[in-house]
Design a protein with these regions (language model features):
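TPR-repeat structural position
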Residues: 62-63, 133, 167, 211
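Residue-level recognition of tetratricopeptide repeat
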Residues: 45, 116, 149-150, 184, ...
Length: 243
């Protein structure tokens, strides 16, 4: 099955993310499970340009990528403004959840594909590459204001918070990710993002000297995936420091 645009971008940008998110661990390339329920909302021309921008970011050419990303973000934002009280989702479960919330609040809401937020998401990666974590956080906060349950956005926001040493914000975000991931319709996606949340929580616990909590998080990650090398490495690190 053809991978969604989100999965393609995540695969290419993982090394960029890993460079700042897990400084003690060996960089582990992970095959992000395909989101079988995601819809490709972006027009083909925008998809091609976004993939080109992503390739530039991957090759550390953020200065060259930024003009292209700025244009794509502008185009995507213009599309989002066409919709009333717009929200975004990447699967049917999250779409229904957003519509139910809107119905309960008495607000008319239009839910579009989360693909429309990918240009800003990739621009956040570019900010990370530039070590401009505050700008990356602002980009991701804007994304999450529209797509509050999408796991890739929550995961990156938590990583940025950890990089900024805002561990309270990181903890809140990763706990949101952990809960959101449980609702994903694809079991591989659900396990992958729950593991990412637990590793993010473990990292923050280590940085705050909460060794027991960190060990528990990494153990939970390994219960989900015994072959999670990043969790294995971090658990070994924690055990060495608890002796």
């Amino acid at each position: 099955m053809k991978k969604s645009l989100s999965a393609i971008l995540l695969l290419a940008l993982l090394p960029v993310q890993a460079a700042f998110a897990e400084p003690r661990s060996e960089v582990v390339r992970v095959d992000v499970p395909d989101n079988k329920t995601a819809q490709n909302g972006l027009p083909a021309v925008m998809q091609r340009e976004l993939e080109r921008a992503m390739a530039l970011v991957h090759n550390h050419q953020t200065a060259e990528a930024m003009p292209l990303l700025n244009r794509l973000v502008g185009q995507a934002d213009a599309e989002l403004r066409r919709h009333k009280n717009v929200r975004a989702a990447g699967n049917r479960v999250h779409t229904l959840r957003l519509l139910l919330e809107a119905a309960n609040s008495g607000r008319d809401t239009e839910v579009v594909s989360s693909e429309w937020l990918m240009p800003r998401y990739v621009r956040a990666f570019a900010r990370v590459e530039q070590k401009n974590y505050a700008a990356a956080a602002a980009e991701l906060d804007a994304v999450l204001a529209v797509a509050s349950y999408e796991p890739q956005f929550l995961a990156e926001r938590g990583q940025v918070a950890n990089a900024m040493k805002d561990f309270a914000a990181a903890e809140r975000t990763f706990k949101r990710l952990h809960e959101s991931a449980k609702t994903l319709p694809d079991p591989a996606q659900a396990a992958f993002y729950q593991g990412a949340a637990l590793r993010g929580l473990g990292y923050g616990a280590v940085e705050r000297g909460q060794w027991q909590a960190a060990e528990q998080y990494y153990r939970q990650a390994l219960q989900l995936n015994p072959n999670d090398r990043a969790a294995q490495n971090e658990l070994q690190f924690v055990r060495q420091h608890r002796r």
